[in-house]
A protein has these predicted regions:
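Glyoxalase I/VOC metalloenzyme domain signal
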Residues: 1-9, 13-33, 43-250
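Fe(II)/2-oxoglutarate oxygenase catalytic core
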Residues: 38-41
Length: 250
């Protein structure tokens, strides 16, 4: 399956217990869309008005983490749901979802109502989170996976260094690490590559400042580690199944 991807639209986490993951993510200082309506989403201010920027939590078996790629034209399954804001205003969301692809789990999406993921009360977070900047994956052969995705998405590919490939279609980056490079880069949280590869393992979230986030995590008894560049790292166990790298912008 080949597409002309505009950007990585969102990260989709299919979990056995999404509400447990939502609770952990709230302890990290994220706002989520209202409980009781699937999916629960962590939404951010997007770079483009018609390309949302978010993470979604879905209930399902087996658990899988997949990338959603935004396209302008797509035929597929139409999914609709409605959330209610705190002031009682109903927000309707409609998304057309295409077939799954590989070698990393991914699928194409076309938004009927992109504004639904940009409500002001959902894109402001107590931890100062601003945007989903990057997604991290691990593969035995990063170059081969990057090459396959370049062809599938009409993407640009760059070798950052030996053991790390960058795949880019828009604003949000995909970094594909070798197991050794990933474990070395994120050794502060004792990161371990999954057994089944390739796999998506984490995200980079832009935040305003590091110190308020650190104070919030300490107050909520959430373990974290610090890395070069004032980055704040939380392990998958603390953050709903994915490693989170918080990158301060100030």
């Amino acid at each position: 399956m080949k597409i002309s991807a505009r950007d990585i639209d969102h990260l989709s986490l299919t979990l056995t217990e999404p509400e447990a993951a939502a609770t952990r993510l709230q302890q990290l200082g994220f706002n989520l869309t209202p409980e009781g309506v699937e999916p629960r989403c962590i939404c951010f201010q997007p770079d483009q008005d018609d390309v949302p920027n978010y993470v979604e939590l879905l209930q399902g078996e087996p658990p899988v983490t997949a990338l959603a790629l935004n396209v302008t034209e797509l035929e597929g399954e139409e999914r609709t749901h409605a959330w209610e804001t705190e002031d009682g205003f109903e927000v309707d969301a409609g998304v057309v979802v295409g077939e799954s692809g590989g070698p990393l789990p991914w699928f194409a999406v076309r938004h009927e109502t992109p504004d639904a993921f940009m409500e002001p009360e959902w894109i402001v977070h107590p931890n100062g989170a601003l945007a989903l900047m990057a997604v991290h994956a691990v593969a035995e052969k990063p170059k081969e996976v990057a090459k396959a995705l370049k062809e599938a998405w009409s993407a640009k590919v760059e070798e950052v260094f030996d053991g790390c490939m960058l795949v880019k279609t828009g604003t949000v980056e995909l970094l594909i690490w070798s197991p050794d490079a990933y474990q070395s880069e994120y050794k502060a949280i004792e990161a371990m590559a999954p057994q089944d590869l390739p796999a998506i393992v984490g995200v980079t979230i832009a935040i305003e400042r590091a110190r308020p986030l650190q104070a919030l995590l300490r107050a909520n008894n959430v373990p974290f580690a610090l890395a070069e560049g004032d980055r704040v790292l939380t392990s998958p166990e603390q953050s709903g199944g994915v490693m989170i790298e918080f990158l301060p912008q100030n």
